[in-house]
């Protein structure tokens, strides 16, 4: 009720609430109240694809069954677009935004004032992305009721906040121009190395600017969640692999019997080193028509460690996060079977089926890419063990996947997280970066919570 009332009082708000604190339910309660006050009002909800087709429909059926909705996704979205006038809620995945934008430009979608909800608003944190720029052009379509929702609003620091708040107030609080915002609050350098660091004392100015429309609810005050137990498993590279890893790091290349792998930049090198640690590296060749990517397999160290952890789990379901597709093939070879996997190329219907089976306890090992499962998916009833075969650079993806298990509805008394890391390598660097980013985001949470929001 606190979040619902905050929306009704302020109109445009940011629900900066921990995953599982009921953001979706609060928004639906607010929509029901506003529908009574403003008959005919419609709401557009933008969300990641899986929450669009699973979470929002389930939550509407549970908490607001009188609200009629449609989902503009899939092959029939053009037809359903013409039938939206009678719907209370129109749900659109971010992946369909370009299509929706073109429909609006062509006036094939009714142009009027809609309440708008940005679910997982950190997906519009980049001020220069095509997604954000399209939203900026569509802002005149949206009423004064605008809601941003995120449990991970600033995964890369406070600089991530500008475009999310711009969608709410057209630049009133954090300036109407990103360059002005960056110059006012941050030190910015580049090229060749681009760095953005907060100016001394600027954090408090940002916190004060956004405080009045931000609702921050700390999980400790509202939820009795199981603790997260973290175990880091450090692997030492054997001498030959250590020699090859160091050579790749120093020389930006690595030789194989049939090819030579090159890293053209520091960023490319970082990616090649991370591939190496996961068991293989990609090389690219041009066959005259297109670029072909070839996988060169190196080792199975992490897959073998996962096998050991599965034995320790003693039959309890395990959720395992990977970063590269070749990891799945290595895992299948080591485990001697093909566990279900959800990543970019997995059809949504298959992914939904796997998640349902997981929640019923029918899948002993589910392999996922955090970008495919992390946002707004309910899989907490299926298990309490998470293994990171590879950590992502993104704090958002990292925390979102963790919060799929550490949330309301988790049946176990604790969630166990294993991180498989290779010592004295990029793995350790990534873990340190995630820790620093988390500290910055936690400072934001603490400041807003202490302010009473």
Residue ranges of predicted features:
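Conserved Helicase C-terminal RecA-like lobe
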Residues: 8-12, 19-22, 26-48, 224-249, ...
């Amino acid at each position: 009720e606190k979040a619902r009332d905050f929306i009704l009082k302020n109109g445009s708000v940011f629900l900066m609430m921990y995953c599982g604190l009921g953001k979706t339910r609060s928004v639906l309660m607010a929509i029901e109240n506003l529908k009574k006050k403003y008959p005919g009002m419609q709401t557009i909800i933008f969300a990641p694809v899986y929450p669009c087709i699973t979470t929002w429909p389930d939550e509407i059926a549970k908490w607001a069954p009188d609200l009629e909705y449609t989902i503009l996704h899939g092959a029939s979205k053009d037809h359903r677009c013409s039938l939206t006038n009678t719907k209370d809620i129109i749900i659109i995945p971010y992946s369909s935004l370009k299509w929706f934008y073109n429909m609006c430009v062509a006036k094939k979608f009714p142009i009027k004032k809609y309440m708008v909800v940005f679910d997982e608003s950190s997906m519009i944190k980049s001020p220069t992305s095509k997604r954000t720029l399209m939203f900026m052009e569509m802002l005149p379509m949206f009423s004064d009721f605008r809601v941003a929702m995120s449990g991970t609003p600033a995964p890369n620091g406070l600089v991530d906040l500008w475009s999310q708040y711009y969608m709410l107030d057209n630049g009133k609080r954090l300036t109407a121009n990103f360059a002005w915002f960056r110059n006012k609050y941050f030190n910015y350098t580049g090229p060749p190395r681009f760095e953005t660091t907060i100016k001394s004392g600027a954090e408090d100015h940002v916190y004060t600017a956004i405080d009045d429309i931000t609702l921050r609810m700390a999980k400790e005050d509202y939820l009795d969640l199981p603790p997260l137990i973290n175990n880091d498993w450090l692997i030492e590279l054997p001498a030959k692999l250590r020699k090859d890893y160091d050579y790749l790091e120093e020389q930006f290349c690595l030789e194989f019997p049939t090819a030579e792998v090159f890293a053209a930049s520091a960023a490319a090198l970082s990616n090649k080193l991370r591939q190496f640690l996961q068991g293989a590296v990609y090389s690219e060749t041009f066959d005259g028509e297109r670029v072909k990517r070839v996988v060169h397999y190196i080792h199975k160290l992490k897959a073998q460690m996962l096998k050991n952890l599965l034995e320790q789990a003693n039959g309890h379901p395990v959720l395992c996060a990977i970063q590269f597709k070749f990891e799945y093939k290595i895992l299948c070879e080591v485990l001697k079977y093909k566990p279900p996997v959800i990543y970019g190329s997995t059809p949504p219907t298959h992914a939904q089926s796997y998640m349902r089976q997981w929640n019923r306890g029918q899948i002993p090992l589910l392999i996922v890419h955090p970008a495919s499962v992390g946002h707004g998916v309910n899989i907490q009833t299926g298990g309490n063990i998470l293994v990171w075969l590879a950590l992502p650079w993104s704090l958002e993806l990292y925390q979102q996947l963790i919060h799929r298990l550490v949330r309301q509805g988790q049946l176990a008394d604790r969630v166990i997280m294993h991180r498989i890391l290779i010592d004295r390598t990029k793995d350790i660097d990534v873990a340190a970066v995630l820790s620093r980013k988390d500290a910055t985001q936690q400072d934001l949470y603490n400041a807003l919570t202490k302010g009473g929001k």
